[in-house]
């Protein structure tokens, strides 16, 4: 189940009831999110439903899951078509499997953030395709009993996953519930719009994956064949390794020594993390000490180096500063014309009643406003002048050479 993540999509339905949440950047700077449910009948309401992406398909397909989305990009479409895998896409099946929350729109939410589905609607949609939700689920992990973590060994209490400079999210361990409680990028608790419950997980994974850019020059490409990573549970963390054969192959997780990783039963959060420019990870222990984490993954050949990304970011920022400065100058000049008219009116009133303190205060306030506008113009004009290309001086005219006839005789 792909969920919309952009501004205006929160709170989302079904995030607390999902068995697994998977998050990672597929394009732009905001991480995409998908929810995985073990039982379709456990889905009371989930959404707002977003567009499908192939990164999340590679997590869901090995589980024999039904991908549910409204539209999808070309890479997700190509993958499903190649495999002959039936999904449920609202772009094609419409209201047979999806519904619109009018009350949410009436509350001010955009239309695209009001579409949802339910377990019953999913079953109806699959029936329209002659498909069924019945079938065996493939376990995502090797579940089993893990040793209890002693308080003095809680070295993985607070995790910050920075997906971009504008999308940094936290998972904090609650010793009372034994869950990692998730916060939104703005620091607010991530809650379920269906029941108001805060989203929490028994297990948290950060899977390192080398990344680059696909051939459209925009969509993120990840090497999903394997890498290192982090596993957090019970307030402690350990380094792990993971492998995956292909798009339909399951994850194989091992501990640092290569032994199969035993995962505690419960809900799980998985972050796909490329470690490219603008991304970061911070993990602290119960005493606040920052942990030393594995080195970030190397870039794919199509990836952009940190140096090149920083240079491009600075170039973009410089261009934006010029745009902002010009807009500020234009606006200040327009406001200045009005302010000068106000000053003239205020001065005329003062001339007629020079002892009136209220009129003098109005005049002084207008003058202060004019001074502020002039300063705004000066400050932003300085930015424009500094960015303007230097004028090339005109070439010097060549002096004609003296002829031998004009050379005086000795």
Language-model features and meaning:
Residues 4-20, 27-306:
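A surface/extracellular/periplasmic glyco- and lipid-processing/surface-interacting theme
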Residues 304-410:
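Extended amphipathic alpha-helical heptad-repeat regions
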Residues 25, 80, 404-406:
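Hydrophobic, Leu/Ile/Phe/Ala-enriched alpha-helical segments that form helix-helix packing faces
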Residues 1-2, 410:
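Low-complexity/repetitive intrinsically disordered segments
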């Amino acid at each position: 189940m792909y969920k919309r993540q952009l501004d205006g999509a929160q709170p989302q339905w079904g995030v607390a009831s999902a068995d697994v949440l998977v998050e990672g950047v597929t394009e732009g700077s905001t991480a995409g999110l998908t929810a995985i449910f073990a039982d379709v009948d456990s889905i009371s309401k989930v959404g707002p439903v977003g567009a499908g992406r192939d990164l999340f398909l590679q997590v869901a397909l090995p589980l024999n899951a039904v991908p549910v989305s409204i539209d999808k990009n070309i890479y997700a479409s190509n993958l499903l078509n190649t495999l002959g895998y039936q999904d449920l896409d609202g772009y094609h099946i419409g209201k047979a499997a999806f519904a619109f929350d009018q009350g949410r729109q009436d509350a001010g939410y955009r239309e695209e953030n009001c579409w949802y589905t339910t377990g019953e609607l999913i079953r109806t949609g699959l029936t329209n395709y002659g498909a069924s939700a019945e079938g065996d689920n493939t376990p995502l992990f090797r579940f089993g009993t893990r040793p209890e973590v002693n308080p003095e060994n809680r070295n993985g209490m607070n995790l910050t996953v920075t997906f971009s400079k504008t999308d940094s999210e936290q998972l904090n361990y609650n010793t009372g519930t034994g869950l990692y409680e998730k916060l939104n990028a703005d620091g607010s608790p991530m809650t379920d719009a269906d029941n108001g419950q805060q989203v929490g997980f028994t297990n948290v994974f950060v899977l390192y994956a080398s990344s680059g850019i696909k051939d459209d020059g925009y969509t993120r490409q990840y090497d999903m064949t394997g890498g290192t990573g982090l596993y957090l549970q019970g307030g402690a963390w350990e380094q792990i390794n993971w492998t995956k054969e292909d798009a339909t192959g399951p994850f194989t997780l091992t501990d640092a020594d290569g032994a199969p990783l035993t995962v505690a039963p419960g809900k799980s959060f998985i972050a796909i993390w490329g470690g490219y420019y603008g991304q970061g990870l911070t993990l602290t222990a119960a005493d606040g000490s920052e942990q030393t984490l594995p080195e970030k993954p190397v870039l794919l050949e199509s990836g952009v180096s940190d140096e090149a990304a920083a240079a491009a970011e600075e170039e973009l920022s410089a261009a934006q500063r010029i745009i902002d400065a010009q807009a500020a100058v234009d606006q200040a000049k327009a406001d200045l014309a009005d302010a000068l008219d106000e000053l003239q009116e205020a001065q005329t009133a003062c001339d007629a009643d020079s002892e009136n303190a209220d009129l003098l205060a109005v005049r002084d306030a207008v003058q202060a406003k004019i001074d502020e506008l002039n300063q705004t113009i000066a400050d932003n004009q300085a930015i424009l002048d500094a960015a303007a290309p230097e004028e090339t001086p005109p070439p010097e005219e060549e002096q004609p050479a003296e002829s031998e006839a004009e050379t005086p005789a000795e």
